[in-house]
């Protein structure tokens, strides 16, 4: 069974894990109603995507 020859230091362990953090989702602004929305998705408040109504306003 493989066993490490030397102890991994706290600094080396933390440097290895430096890129493992989670990034928050990027929010853009809806050009129609100025509400925050996720990119490449229809606006949840007004139902438009790329200037076209894709979800009817009665459904929202």
From Swiss-Prot:
One of its GO terms (biological process) is translation. Residues 1-16 have a biased composition (Basic residues). Gene3D superfamilies: Single helix bin (1.20.5.640). GO terms for cellular component: large ribosomal subunit. Residues 1-20 are annotated as: Disordered. Pfam families: Ribosomal_L32p (PF01783). Belongs to the bacterial ribosomal protein bL32 family. HAMAP family: Ribosomal_bL32. This is Large ribosomal subunit protein bL32. It comes from Geobacter metallireducens (strain ATCC 53774 / DSM 7210 / GS-15). The gene is rpmF.
């Amino acid at each position: 069974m493989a066993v490490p020859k030397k102890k991994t230091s706290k600094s080396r362990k933390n440097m290895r894990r430096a890129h493992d953090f989670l990034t928050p989702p990027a929010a853009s602004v809806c050009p129609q109603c100025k509400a925050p929305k996720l990119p490449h998705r229809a606006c949840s408040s007004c139902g438009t995507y790329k200037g076209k109504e894709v979800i009817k306003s009665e459904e929202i």
